[in-house]
């Protein structure tokens, strides 16, 4: 089994997932990545959450490693291995963004993010791209689709025109 690189704790997570046109999504992906589908349908997800206790495999949790994040992702395959492809990654942590851009070439950008949860009302505000308010009936919904979306342990990126 491969060594993990980064460990992190997620809290206040919300997955807002919706079907998208396969051909439209395919046209927005790097050529070497395949659109992964669930029951023949392609999906995008908007995922706001709070990340904390970030650490590399050789370090304790890093100081000042709590941040809010908002990402737009889709689900892909590379050489038949399922993974995630990020279109955008917004975070309110300038140093974290800089390091993620430089070390992992991820498309992080700085945003002023506000994530609030009051009972079943989830409110997300981003100065870059989004104002979202969702009322949730059941906070823990497990379906075949939610398992397909969340049980992915690989992210793909393009560096120097190669999949990494």
Spans of features found by a protein language model:
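Hydrophobic, proline/glycine-rich low-complexity stretches
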Residues: 1-57
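Internal, well-folded beta-alpha domain core
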Residues: 13, 71-164
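A glycine-rich, hydrophobic loop/mini-helix early in the fold
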Residues: 38-42, 51-94
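Short, charged/polar low-complexity linear motifs in solvent-exposed/disordered segments
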Residues: 45, 52-54, 63, 101-104, ...
């Amino acid at each position: 089994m491969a060594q993990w690189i980064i460990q992190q704790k997620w809290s206040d997570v919300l997955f807002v997932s919706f079907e998208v046109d396969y051909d439209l999504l395919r046209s927005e992906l790097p050529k070497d990545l395949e659109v992964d589908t669930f029951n023949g349908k392609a999906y995008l997800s908007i995922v706001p959450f709070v990340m904390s206790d970030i650490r590399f495999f050789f370090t304790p949790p890093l100081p000042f490693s709590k941040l809010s994040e908002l990402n737009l992702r889709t689900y892909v395959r590379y050489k038949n291995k399922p993974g995630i492809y990020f279109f955008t990654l917004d975070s309110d942590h300038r140093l974290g963004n800089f390091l993620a851009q430089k070390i992992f070439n991820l498309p992080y950008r700085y945003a002023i993010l506000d994530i609030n949860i009051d009972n079943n009302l989830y409110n997300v505000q981003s100065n870059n791209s989004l104002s979202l308010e969702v009322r949730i009936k059941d906070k823990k919904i497990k379906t075949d689709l939610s398992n397909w979306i969340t049980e992915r342990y690989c992210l793909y990126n393009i560096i120097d025109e190669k999949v990494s």
